[in-house]
Amino acid sequence: MEEFQGYLELDRSWQDDFLYPLILQESIYALVHNQDLGFNRSILLSKKKGYDTKYSLLVVKRLVIRMYQQNFVILSLNHSNKNAFFVPNKNLYSQRISEVFAVIAEIPVSMRVMSSLKGKERKQYKNLQSIHSIFPFLENKFSRLNHVLDILIPHPVHPKILVQTIRYCVKDISCLHLLQLLLYEYCNNGITLKGSVSNFSKKKNQRFLLFLYNSYVCECESIFVFLRNRSSHLRSTSYGAFLARVYFYLKLEHFLKVFTKHCRVILQFFKDPFIHYIRYQGKWILASRGTFLLMTKFKYYFVNFWQCHFYLWLQTRRIYINKSLNQPIDFIGFRLSVRLNPSVVRSQMLENAFLIYNGIKKFETLVPTMSLIGSLAKEKFCNVLGHPISKPAWADLSDSDIIRRFGRMCRNLSHYYSGSSKKGGLYRIKYILRLSCARTLARKHKSTVRAFMKRLGSEFFEEFFFKEEKVISLILSRDSSISRRLYRGPIWYFDIFCIHDLASHND
C-alpha cells in the first residue's frame, strides 16, 4: 500500500482525479485478489484454463495495456458485438475492472472513517459491525416503545440515479464516467439492483454490487439525519465491507443547517419522536413511542420523500405498522416480538391485603424453526415435514469429512442463535442434522441407522456438542461452575459479520 500513498493524501482536493490512476496499477488487482480469496502467488502466475485464468497476471497486463490506448473509451462507449472489451460471453475484463473500482471507491470513505475514529472508538468499531451487536440494543430499547415500522427498501434503481448518488463520496470525474459505463453494461446483461443483498451473493461481481447497493441505501437514509438531531438514541448498522455508516454521520452538519433553515415545519412535525432505527440488507425497522397517527404520518412522508428524491414509486403496502411488536417480525434470521409477562404482587396493609397485577414487556428473539426446516429441505437434509433424510451428494466423502461438515453446520447454527430466548427450535434443527448425518453414513456403509450409531457410540456426538461447550467455557470461567450452570441468559457474539448459507462447508 505504500506506493499508493501519493494518491491518498487527505489534504488533496476532492475535485482532483486521483482515484482513476489506481485502476491502471497492476498491483491494485493483486491487492483485490488478496482481499477476496487470500493471496496465492501460484494462482496469480498460473496460465492454465479455468478458475485461475481469471486472476492471471498476464490477463491483468493485457487489460492495463488496453486501458492505456487512446481509443479505448470510445470503443467501449460504442459497444458492439465486435468490441473485444465487453463481450457478453467473455466479460472477464469488465468483471476485473468493476471489482477494482469498488475497492478504490471505498478508499475515500474508509479514510474518513479512520480519521474520525480515535482510541477506544477505533477498537470498538469492529464489534459494532457485528450482526449480534444489534440485539442488545433491541433488548434495551424496543420493549419500551409503542409502534414499529417494518420497511422494505424500494428498488430497482436507474443507473443515472446511482451515479448521482456516488458523486457524494467520489469526486473523480474519470471514475464516474467509468462507473456509468459499467452500469450500462450490467443493465444490458440483465443485472439489476434488487432490494435484497442476499441476491448478490450468487453474482460474480459481488463486491461491486454491494458497493452500489450500500451507496444507494446510504443516500436513502438521508431522511433520518435531521431526525437524529431530535433523538440521540438513533442507531444504525452497516452491511458488508462498505463503510458508509460513519460517512452518513459525517454529513450531519451540512444537512442540519439545511433542514434547520428551510424545513422548520418538518422539524416541528417530528419534534421529539424518540426514534430507534436499525437496518440490515433490504429491510429497515423504525420504532417510536409516538402514537399510531404519528407513525402513519411517518409512513406517508417516507413514500413522498423517495418518490420525489429518487423517482421511485414506493407502494404503501411495503411499509407495515406493528403495534409494539405484537406480531412477530422476521429480521436477520430471527423472529422478533415483545411478549407481556404478567406478574402478581401481594400487598399487605394492616388487616387489608391487595393483589396488584403488573405486566412486564419482554423482548424475545425466537428461532424461525419452519423457515430453517424449509432451507434444510431445499438442501436435501430433510423433507418438507422436517423428517431427516440422507444427503446422497456427500455419501462419497470419507466418514470424517461427513461428520465434520454436519458438525460445522450445527456449531454455526448454535453460534448464531446463541442469544435466542427459546432454544427448543434450535434443538430440533440440530436433531435433524445429527440424524441426517447418521442416515448419510448408514447409506454409505449399507447399514441401518441404529446399528451404525451403536457402533460409533458417544464419539459420534462429540463433533456436535463438545466443541460448542468449549466456546461457552471461554465466556463463563471454568472456576465458576455454579454460575455457568445457573446462567440462562442470551449470549451474543461480536465476530459475526455475515450470514452464510446453511449448506456451506468452507472452513
Curated annotation (Swiss-Prot):
GO terms for biological process: mRNA processing; RNA splicing; tRNA processing. Keywords: Chloroplast, mRNA processing, Plastid, RNA-binding, tRNA processing. It is found in: Plastid, Chloroplast. InterPro entries: Domain_X, Maturase_MatK, Maturase_MatK_N. One of its GO terms (cellular component) is chloroplast. One of its GO terms (molecular function) is RNA binding. Usually encoded in the trnK tRNA gene intron. Probably assists in splicing its own and other chloroplast group II introns. Belongs to the intron maturase 2 family. MatK subfamily. This is Maturase K.
